[in-house]
Amino acid sequence: MSDGNEHLAPGVDDYLTGHSTPPDALLRDLKAETARRFPGRGRMQISQEQGTFMSMLAGLMGARHAVEVGTFTGYSSICLARGMATDGKLICCDISQEWTSLARAYWQKAGLAGRIDLRLGPALDTLRALPGGAWLDLAFIDADRAGLTGYWEEIVPRMRPGGVILVDNVLLHGRIFEPEPDAEALAVRQFNEHALADDRVVLAMLPIADGLTVARRT
């Protein structure tokens, strides 16, 4: 999750944001309420252009079955669910009752509560309990860095051919480039190499927000 793109030259992020469809009043209200209720946590939300991109992608795919790992206060899940087919279902994985209580309130306001299934608990356990087979259209991973490879390995086999996996914060604010990365940065670096070597997908790492990997199941 990230607010803006710190990897671009000064002024470029503002220009990109200014030339992308802006969030509506509900998403603006959610962002503001998140900042009020959880000071210092605002960076955990995706950027507005990332939300627009994800909603567009879900719509272009006609996604009906999706999963999100890491929901926070619900901004990204609203973007995904809005783009999905009207009969679609989004499964959201998170461990925080406090954060997701705000998400639930805004899902209700957005008219999406019936299309989003929140599952509280360790995400790896939730993913392992999902049906087997290739049935997922879309997945978004935006959670603890140490768990990225584990989440990936549970999700990839469940993706249908042509399904898309999005992974956020793959640049980790530039920390992955440090000569002696800390444990979190090292986990992201190792995940990036793991995903790149996975012959079940083709992928591109995009300079959206704090780095977004887009992988298509072959």
Where are these regions (language model features)?
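S-adenosylmethionine/decaboxylated-SAM
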Residues: 43-44, 48-218
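Interfacial helix-start motif at the membrane-water boundary
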Residues: 39-41
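N-terminal auxiliary segments of SAM/dcSAM-dependent transferases
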Residues: 1-27, 32, 37
